[in-house]
């Protein structure tokens, strides 16, 4: 299966979307203040590539604030801690992440296109696999006692299914979706689904079904070439 990679001259702009095997060296953790300032400027330029996905200008700034938090040194990466660390109003950032209207699919399409520009090859490989995060509580969306590959056993946690891409030029993630265990769709979980903002029309899907959806969506975007699909057990 293959989509087409459109040829453009924007290769340099796309480098943040993946790891280029021949050009990237292992980080030495010796960044100077000047390096960090330059990085922040480059991140602003990079975010402008996604401008068309947002309805309002302030959403671009909110997305940049959120990215700063994810890339920062905070031990916890939830919205509240990110907002406090970035001196942003907590409710304002929570609204942006969870409720404000912006085009998620457009963000992914731009991201995938940039991967195609930098890493795309006709015989590239689409990769499907799952990843997990162990959780202590029961309030996180989709959390349940399930197999978590990160610890190699049944544990209380969240599991996501992910689509990646690899070629001789490098590799990158494209998109992921949270796996919602079947018990979460039971009537007794109605209040919890509502509290977590789970869409009312969401239905149970197996991990292979989610992986296939991710793959089909990537093909329909038609901006990344690959001839092979590889998947681990899901």
Task: Report each predicted region and the residues it spans.
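Short Lys/Arg-rich cationic patches that frequently serve as NLS/NoLS or arginine-rich RNA/DNA-binding motifs
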Residues: 1-16
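Conserved, well-structured functional cores that handle cations and Mg-NTP chemistry
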Residues: 2, 20-234
């Amino acid at each position: 299966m293959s989509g087409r990679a459109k040829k453009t001259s924007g290769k340099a702009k796309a480098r943040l979307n993946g790891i280029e095997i021949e050009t990237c060296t292992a980080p030495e953790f010796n960044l100077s203040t000047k390096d960090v300032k330059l990085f922040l400027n480059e991140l602003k330029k990079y975010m402008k590539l996604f401008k068309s996905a947002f309805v309002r200008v302030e959403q671009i700034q909110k997305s940049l604030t959120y990215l700063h938090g994810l890339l920062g040194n905070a031990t916890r990466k939830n919205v509240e801690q990110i907002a406090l660390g970035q001196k942003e109003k907590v409710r304002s950032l929570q609204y942006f992440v969870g409720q404000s209207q912006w085009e998620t699919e457009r963000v992914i399409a731009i991201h995938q296109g940039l991967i195609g520009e930098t890493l795309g090859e006709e015989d590239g490989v689409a990769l499907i696999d799952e990843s997990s995060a162990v959780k202590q509580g029961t309030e996180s969306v989709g959390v349940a006692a399930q197999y978590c590959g990160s610890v190699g056993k049944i544990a209380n946690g969240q599991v996501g299914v992910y689509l990646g891409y690899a070629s001789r030029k490098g590799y990158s993630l494209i998109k992921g979706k949270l796996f919602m265990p079947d018990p979460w769709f039971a009537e007794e979980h109605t209040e919890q689904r509502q509290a977590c903002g789970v869409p009312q029309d969401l239905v149970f899907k197996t991990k292979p079904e989610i992986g296939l959806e991710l793959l089909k969506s990537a093909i329909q975007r038609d901006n990344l070439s690959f001839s092979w699909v590889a998947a681990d057990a899901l």
